[in-house]
Amino acid sequence: MALKIRLARAGSKKRPYYHIVVADVRAPRDGRFIEQIGSWNPMLPKDSERVKLNEERIKHWLANGALPTDRVLRFLDQAGLAKRPARSNPKKAEPGKKAQERLAAARQAEEEAKAAAEAAAAAPAEAPAEEAAS
């Protein structure tokens, strides 16, 4: 039996309230569950009463192989009960070909400008030394 720690919606229309429950993955979202281990009231401002967790029971179910859903994993991560893996930046977020070409051209122009500035700074420093020698 595969178990999930997930949200079960309660509350009235446009006034959501969620129970954090341990349920079989095949059970309906708001239906049969094994145990209620917390609650989440998104209507409250961000404070300690917004998310309530029974830490002892959550640790028990995590040790027994229950997998939290994404939203519940966020709550557990904030409470320090589970570690949420860092998401890698997908390839889609990388700049396109033209943008990369523009970046490379900008870097090259910046390096050339820096080299020219260094050469200009070095040339006047050498000139007075030659005048002083003559």
Swiss-Prot record:
Ranges of biased composition (kind: Low complexity): 116-134
Biased composition (Basic and acidic residues): 91-101
Keyword Transcription: no
GO cellular component: cytoplasm; small ribosomal subunit
Keywords linked to the UniProt accession: Ribonucleoprotein, Ribosomal protein
Family: Belongs to the bacterial ribosomal protein bS16 family.
NCBIfam families per UniProt: S16
Record's protein name: Small ribosomal subunit protein bS16
Species of provenance: Chelativorans sp. (strain BNC1)
